[in-house]
Amino acid sequence: MDSDDEVVEEAVEGHLDDDGLPHGFCTVTYSSTDRFEGNFVHGEKNGRGKFFFFDGSTLEGYYVDDALQGQGVYTYEDGGVLQGTYVDGELNGPAQEYDSDGRLIFKGQYKDNNRHGVCWIHYPDGGSLVGEVNEDGEMTGEKIAYVYPDQRTALYGKFIDGEMLEGKLATLMATEEGRPHFEVTSGSSVYHFDKSTSSCISSDALLPDPYESERVYVADSLISSAGEGLFSKVAVGPNTVMSFYNGVRITHQEVDSRDWALNGNTLSLDEETVIDVPEPYNHVSKYCASLGHKANHSFTPNCVYDLFVHPRFGPIKCIRTLRAVEAEEELTVAYGYDHSPPGKSGPEAPEWYQVELKAFQATQQK
């Protein structure tokens, strides 16, 4: 992102002045294989120009006396973009960063190429971190907050490099010129980063999530023989995060090697990890820190599993609405068992699912 790294000029395509220096529009290739295309005045970059770096990233902007000045656009090799303000070739001032899908992931200030002042880090799931970064540009301090996807519910307190050490429930009351104003809830419980392991689901299994508690509750399912289900407390629109699916973290190999009866609350997180809510934690009297495992299956679901970076649980999955949902409506998801595993005649799924699948397919054929 720094526009004036020390590089040795190797080849010039374009007009040269009487001293053999680039003059006018030229393409200059450096010993590092970085390339610059733009306007020169007697060997110095002046006017519009663009660096093409060896790793596939680029930097484009307006140069004055060989240094990038004003608005510049740095494009990462993966397609992400940083739009920032440059002074004498260094990031100084407001900046915004977007991922390769065009989603805003950072908004704040830079000083001498480091993040500075109050900054916002936005996650793809809708949550965000906000606070005044330290001298290294890290979210470290005692006035940092994680803000849930509703942009109102927050956990405010002490963080180190974005990890919550001690957070209390707070409400984001207003944001003025990028600076948030929080009101901490009196008598709030204290939350901290508490990522599960293969043997520990949570250090405080009965401490509910404050965001989830406002949106869902557990009651007897309306689906026959399904036991308990997950219901919405409030009417919400589509694409709303409703609940979180935390659990112990085990391997796919462990899940595949055991009986289906033990896999009633397993959910794949990624290629290595499966989240599981085993006995006795499937009972809310033993575990209620998250409730996403209570959502039952439907072939016509109103919700979907989605990835989520949680301030307390770390990388997990959440339950997000597919459509508008009414208050008191049961939330359902498609469990997504493999209907056509290689070398097998039927779905790789528990018996109850296979029975429901046949019944659903029969209704679709009518």
UniProtKB/Swiss-Prot annotation:
The protein's Enzyme Commission number: 2.1.1.364
Site (Histone H3K4 binding): Y245, D256, T266, K317, Y335
MORN repeat positions: 36-58, 59-81, 106-128
Keyword Cell membrane among record annotations: no
Gene Ontology biological process terms from the UniProt entry: chromatin organization; DNA damage response; heterochromatin organization; peptidyl-lysine dimethylation; peptidyl-lysine monomethylation; positive regulation of DNA-templated transcription; regulation of DNA repair; response to ethanol
EC class of the enzyme, as a word: transferase
Binding residues annotated for S-adenosyl-L-methionine, in chain numbering: A226, G227, E228, N296, H297, E356
GO cellular component terms listed in the entry, alphabetical order: chromosome; nucleolus
Disulfide bonds: none
Molecular function via GO: chromatin binding; histone H3K4 monomethyltransferase activity; histone methyltransferase activity; p53 binding; protein-lysine N-methyltransferase activity
Keywords from the named record: Activator, Chromatin regulator, Chromosome, Methyltransferase, Nucleus, Repeat, S-adenosyl-L-methionine, Transcription, Transcription regulation, Transferase
Protein name listed in UniProt: Histone-lysine N-methyltransferase SETD7
Gene: Setd7
